[in-house]
Regions:
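Short alpha-helical elements
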Residues: 1-293
Length: 293
């Protein structure tokens, strides 16, 4: 058995234990490869940085599951499994973030194509509600065309929740979504989330204390607590890992459904490796560039 197949079996056994279900939705003809086996294959591909499906099917040719699925079916079923991958991810997150009270919110740009090609590009323009558009990332001083990944992570570097918005949407609007997902915690953000109205609203509605650094020209200015500044770097490190190891900025999807499924697959893989590191291997959860077998 190859190292790759052994890693696949390890991921599969743990995901089976977490989900407790083999198939998640009805199929008139039962496929040879179950849904949980397919999700394990998706996680393996992202962990090994195999971003080409053609390359993935060459790699698994000698696997026991190799003849059980075709490439076209793999892609179609992968998109249908989007809500179930997120469901499994949330089960892992609930265990990893069980005793967390401090979280960090931030965003990063997801470029679909260069601005010069944006007028003739047809990528992700298949649905009206999710058209990509032009935006600006202040931290990188970057004008880009595409989407923003808005995310919340714990101080132990586990993504609690995330969302994708068009590039032009201001970061602060994501806080309205957070209100429906979280409560009774401290949320750390940068100056982009500075708003007294939203700060009061979050506290009154769901008891979330929003902590942001204040601008130097504000009347009640005082430097932010040093430990909070240090915590805020955690999410930036996570974004760097998504870009480096999981190649989140490399996009081959043509539809929005395909695009968001790729993003979820990468974040779910990150969470899976963190889960295995903590509960199976007993090591630092953020040792991501490490062999499973």
């Amino acid at each position: 058995m190859s190292n790759l197949e052994a890693s696949y079996n390890l991921i599969l056994n743990n995901l089976r234990e977490i989900s407790g279900i083999e198939d998640f939705y009805f199929k008139p003809i039962k496929p040879k490869l179950s849904d949980i086996e397919l999700i394990s294959l998706i996680i393996l591909a992202e962990f090994k940085s195999i971003d080409s499906e053609h390359q993935l099917f060459r790699e698994i040719k000698g696997f026991e599951i190799g003849p059980n699925i075709e490439r076209s079916v793999y892609n179609r079923r992968k998109r249908k499994l989007f809500p179930f991958i997120e469901e499994i991810r949330m089960k892992m997150v609930d265990k990893l973030n069980e005793s967390e009270n401090y979280f960090i919110v931030d965003s990063m740009p997801l470029e679909v194509c260069k601005i010069s090609r944006s007028f003739r590009s047809k990528i992700c323009k298949d649905v009206d509600y999710a058209y990509p558009n032009k935006g600006f990332c202040a931290s990188q001083n970057l004008h880009f065309y595409g989407y923003k990944l808005n995310a919340v992570c714990s101080i132990s570097s586990v993504f609690q929740s995330f969302d994708i918005s068009p590039a032009s949407v201001h970061d602060i609007h994501y806080l309205q979504d957070i209100k429906l997902q979280m409560s009774d915690c401290v949320l750390l953000g940068d100056k982009g989330y500075l708003s007294q109205t939203i700060q009061l609203d979050l506290f009154k509605e769901v008891n979330i204390e929003l902590e942001t650094p204040k601008r130097k020209n504000q009347k009640d200015y005082k430097p932010q607590f040093y430990q909070f500044k240090k915590y805020r770097k955690r999410i930036e490190t996570l974004f760097s890992q998504l870009c480096d190891q999981f190649m989140i900025r490399r996009n081959y999807a043509k539809t929005f459904q395909g695009f968001k499924t790729r993003i979820l697959a990468k974040i779910a893989t990150l969470t899976t490796i963190q889960y295995l590191n903590k509960f199976l291997f007993g090591r630092n959860i953020n040792n991501l560039k490490i062999n499973l077998i």
